[in-house]
Design a protein with these regions (language model features):
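Extracellular glycan-targeting catalytic surfaces
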Residues: 25-239, 248, 272, 316-317, ...
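Long, repeat-rich segments with strong aromatic
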Residues: 249-351
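Bacterial Sec-dependent N-terminal signal peptides
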Residues: 1-26
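Noncatalytic carbohydrate-binding groove/subsite architecture in carbohydrate-active enzymes
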Residues: 232-238, 242, 257, 261-266
Length: 387
């Protein structure tokens, strides 16, 4: 619990940084943060005690990572369907043994109820830890200029993407397997939906003494191969064809990796197509009907809005404005936030199914991206409730 709270504070802090103070500085290739504004915060930290406290918290979190290691994909105790230990593997989150079958196969779906046995396969946790650790370490390096944070971040990236004994092949062929039914699904791509956060971190680390040109080249090659897999594989095409939040996060992944790999034409096409996606996902009143079908409808609505916030933020990097795009019948990201805010503030009772508790974490992160982009009075007047 303490780790999750600290991570939430870190994420909020880093997003807030991207909306404050501007100075002239060489801008690295960042996709979710505005480096010039972040550099302004670093400069202000010399005299601003509040910023100093936030940086101290960031540094504390980074210090806790220095002695940690992530679990390699080769360390899992289960054989992958293809037999290659370097392949990523995970089980479908909401699938459970069928109690009516002697062997429990095939597994059956219980939407919104996560099977804890899935944690026995550690690849998802390993990748998730990689993203969290590299993101934290890279920003600690930037704000403190302490090379030890960069060195640790680069070592983790080598461990996951480069070292022949421990690397992961750049694909998700066997993600979110349904036991007794398949060997992996496109829907499993959602496992790595927070990669865009780490790409900002990698770009920061590229300026460090710890990352060699060979390291940077190999890491970029890994992501270039992963991007090709996302666009051409059976699983990638399946996820591309989805309609709900999976589609939005798929496009966010493709766009961020394309920008990271210098393929702006690919990213621009994603952002252009997002206008059609917006028309298909949102209703004119702001509802996201495909998310409202879920057993945790509030959570999935918030989750999808976060994807839209990330996608819109990245679109700015190529001078495209999704924040203010509106279809002829009024569908827009703005309407999406306006719809959910009264429920988030408990001004209205949630009208759809929500079997889990209402948690504002995802919505809070989505709203932070909207600062300076959208005018949401309910948020501006109640910001403390989302901190």
């Amino acid at each position: 619990m303490k780790k999750n709270i600290a991570l939430k504070v870190l994420v909020c802090f880093l997003i807030i940084l991207s909306f404050l103070g501007i100075i002239n500085a060489q801008t690295p290739k960042l996709f979710l943060a505005d480096f010039n504004k972040v550099a302004g915060v670093k400069k202000s930290a010399v005299t601003n005690k509040d910023i100093q406290k936030q940086i101290a918290l960031l540094q504390k979190n980074a210090d806790q990572i220095l002695d940690k290691q992530i679990v390699s994909v080769v360390e899992k105790q289960f054989a992958t369907p293809c037999g290659n230990k370097h392949e990523y593997m995970s089980l479908a989150s909401y699938y459970w043994p069928d109690p009516s079958k002697p062997d429990g196969l095939p597994y059956i779906r219980k939407d919104g109820q996560r099977n804890p046995d899935n944690d026995k396969i550690t690849d998802h946790k390993g990748f998730d830890d990689l993203i969290k650790y590299v993101t934290t370490l890279s920003w600690a390096y930037y704000f403190t200029n302490d090379e030890k944070y960069a060195a640790k971040g680069v070592s983790l990236l080598r461990f996951w993407c480069i070292d022949t004994a421990t690397y992961m092949l750049p694909n998700l062929n066997h993600a979110q397997i349904i036991m007794g039914t398949d060997t992996g699904r496109g829907i499993g791509i959602i496992d790595v939906h927070m990669i865009p956060n780490m790409l900002d971190g990698i770009s920061i680390l590229e300026s460090s003494a710890s990352m060699s040109k060979a390291d940077a080249k190999a890491i970029h090659q890994w992501f270039d191969q992963f991007l090709a897999w996302l666009q051409t594989s059976v699983n990638g095409k399946q996820e591309f064809a989805t309609k709900n939040n999976h589609k939005t996060y798929y496009e966010t992944l493709v766009a961020s990796i394309a920008l990271f790999c210098g393929k702006q034409d690919v990213a621009k096409q994603v952002f252009t197509n997002a206008k059609t996606l917006m028309a298909s996902q949102f209703e004119p009143d702001g509802k996201l009907p495909l998310e409202l079908e879920r057993t945790n409808a509030f959570s999935y609505t918030s989750f999808c809005l976060k994807a839209w916030s990330m996608l819109s933020t990245m679109a700015e990097k190529v001078n495209l404005d999704l924040w203010h795009f509106q279809t002829n019948d009024g569908r827009s990201i703005q309407k999406g936030f306006e719809y959910i805010m009264p429920y988030a503030l408990a001004e209205k009772k949630w009208e759809y199914q929500q079997i889990g508790p209402i948690n504002l974490k995802e919505l809070s992160q989505a709203l932070l991206f909207t600062k300076g982009k959208l005018v949401i009075p309910e948020y501006n007047n109640n910001a403390s409730k989302f901190s």
